[in-house]
Amino acid sequence: IMYEKNYGRVVFTSSVSGILGSFGQANYGAAKMGMVGLMNNLSREGASHNIHTNCLSPGAATRMTASVPGSSIDVDNPDEGNHPGLVSPAILYLASEDAPNGRIIQAAGGRFASDAVYSNAGVDLGSDATEEDFLGRVDDVLDLSEAELKTQFWK
């Protein structure tokens, strides 16, 4: 239907647990980071049809966050800074006509930020590279001081 109408907005729910990691939440984090991969692919596939696909990475008092060991969250009476409604401005924007394409927005407690994948220029060791070659340049491979936003592989 979106292809036929040449318009659409898709918003997936990711999580800080997937993007940054969270102790004891490997399975959940892996699934939520998978949403970012799905978004990256669909944002490319739908772009020519004005279909924008994005991710929201929310933080709020929910039944799931209340179930984390040591949590003192009361989902029936969340404190003002943890209320789920505080992510609403971001979701409304991502579902709007003005929505970007292929972006991740964090929303928690009235604070908003953007996450993205950054890469450095890389190191070309040639097709006969050895482990020793790699180890000799590993500092350059790991150096993110001049990293740039990546939207395509090796570009």
Spans of model-derived segments:
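Active-site-adjacent segment of SDR/Rossmann-fold oxidoreductases
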Residues: I1-E4, L20, V36, N41-I51, ...
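Active-site "substrate specificity/gating" loop of NAD(P)-dependent dehydrogenases
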Residues: G21-Q25
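Residue(s) in the substrate-gating loop at a strand-loop-helix junction
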Residues: S15
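Hydrophobic structural elements of the Rossmann-like NAD(P)H-binding subdomain
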Residues: V11, T53-L56, G102, A107
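A glycine/serine/threonine-rich, flexible loop-to-helix segment
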Residues: S48, C55-G81, N120
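Conserved catalytic-site region of short-chain dehydrogenase/reductase
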Residues: G18-L20, T62
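Active-site helix of classical SDR
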Residues: A31
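C-terminal helical subdomain
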Residues: V75-K155
